[in-house]
Amino acid sequence: MKKTYFIADLHLSENRPHLTHLFCDFMQQLAPQAEALYILGDLFDFWIGDDEESALIHTVQQQIHALSAQGVKCYFQHGNRDFLIGKRFAAACGMTLLPTYQRIALYGESVLLCHGDTLCIDDVAYQQYRKKVHQKWRQWLFLHLPLKVRLKIAEKIRARSKADKKRKSEEIMDVNPDFVLQTFAQFGVKKIIHGHTHRQHIHHIPPHFTRIVLGDWGDTASILEVNEQQQVRFLTGKE
């Protein structure tokens, strides 16, 4: 039976090698069964440019390239941690970069994909930050800094993000329900799949909308499987 997989929020880093092992297991065992794999952002805990080299980056690149070579279409949508992943890395992986919002035909149904951070409009401070860091001139300047400088900046941003997260309420960091309804209408879809909030769940919204939230990866993987009969289930990679 034809199937498609969706993952997000792996936050891969050198400091958490078990996540890389989970990712490799998934890519080698489950992912080859799919027609397509959609990675909806925050594959990495941070990304400072396609020119960075590390054992982790090399491993991830190899895994995605190998899957793509088997005929599985691989797609990537930027997250709030790895929005600087560019064409160079994508090409090396054999994956296609997607815009902030991407509508796809999923076994006869029109579905909207996004990382999910743009739906959290109540977090005003983050939205202001996001607007700044997505300005092309700021990205150009950052990417032309020495790697060591970029790494220090990224570490400071991560530390600040963790501190901010502790201060903010759970409601502010979740999606805005009214904005979600506006997004359904704007893109003419009845189903949205996203990550970012780490709150794995399938929300059924009256009268006929569905919002599927991908989970983050921790002790186990979090994989959404959708098959050609429109059956939906979450997998942990240990099935």
Curated annotation (Swiss-Prot):
GO terms for cellular component: cytoplasm; extrinsic component of plasma membrane. GO terms for biological process: lipid A biosynthetic process. Its cofactor is Mn(2+). Gene3D superfamilies: 3.60.21.10. It catalyses: UDP-2-N,3-O-bis[(3R)-3-hydroxytetradecanoyl]-alpha-D-glucosamine + H2O = 2-N,3-O-bis[(3R)-3-hydroxytetradecanoyl]-alpha-D-glucosaminyl 1-phosphate + UMP + 2 H(+). It holds the Pfam family Metallophos. It is an enzyme of class 3 (hydrolase). CDD domains: MPP_YbbF-LpxH. This is UDP-2,3-diacylglucosamine hydrolase. It comes from Pasteurella multocida (strain Pm70). The lineage of its organism: Bacteria, Pseudomonadati, Pseudomonadota, Gammaproteobacteria, Pasteurellales.
